[in-house]
Every structure is written in C-alpha cells, then in structure tokens.
C-alpha cells in the first residue's frame, strides 16, 4: 500500500507484512 496522509505509519507497516 502507498501511505495516505493520515495513518501512514500503519499503511506502511501493513505493506511490509
């Protein structure tokens, strides 16, 4: 996933899984 403005850290963490 590409990180959105809000909650970007969570999106990046999910993408690394």
UniProtKB/Swiss-Prot annotation:
Q: Name one GO cellular component term.
A: mitochondrial inner membrane
Kindly state which keywords UniProt assigns to this record, in alphabetical order: Allergen, ATP synthesis, CF(1), Hydrogen ion transport, Ion transport, Membrane, Mitochondrion, Mitochondrion inner membrane, Transport
Tell me which domain of life the UniProt entry assigns to the organism this sequence originates from: Eukaryota
Instruction: State any GO BP term from the record.
Output: ATP biosynthetic process
Q: What is its main location?
A: mitochondrion
Answer whether the UniProt record assigns the keyword Ubl conjugation to this protein: no
Q: Where in the cell is it found?
A: Mitochondrion; Mitochondrion inner membrane
Signal peptide span: none
Per the similarity annotation, which family is this? Belongs to the ATPase epsilon chain family.
Subunit record text: F-type ATPases have 2 components, CF(1) - the catalytic core - and CF(0) - the membrane proton channel. CF(1) has five subunits: alpha(3), beta(3), gamma(1), delta(1), epsilon(1). CF(0) has three main subunits: a, b and c.
Job of this protein: Mitochondrial membrane ATP synthase (F(1)F(0) ATP synthase or Complex V) produces ATP from ADP in the presence of a proton gradient across the membrane which is generated by electron transport complexes of the respiratory chain. F-type ATPases consist of two structural domains, F(1) - containing the extramembraneous catalytic core, and F(0) - containing the membrane proton channel, linked together by a central stalk and a peripheral stalk. During catalysis, ATP turnover in the catalytic domain of F(1) is coupled via a rotary mechanism of the central stalk subunits to proton translocation.
- The protein depicted here goes by the name ATP synthase subunit delta, mitochondrial
Q: Which organism is it from?
A: Penicillium glabrum (Penicillium frequentans)
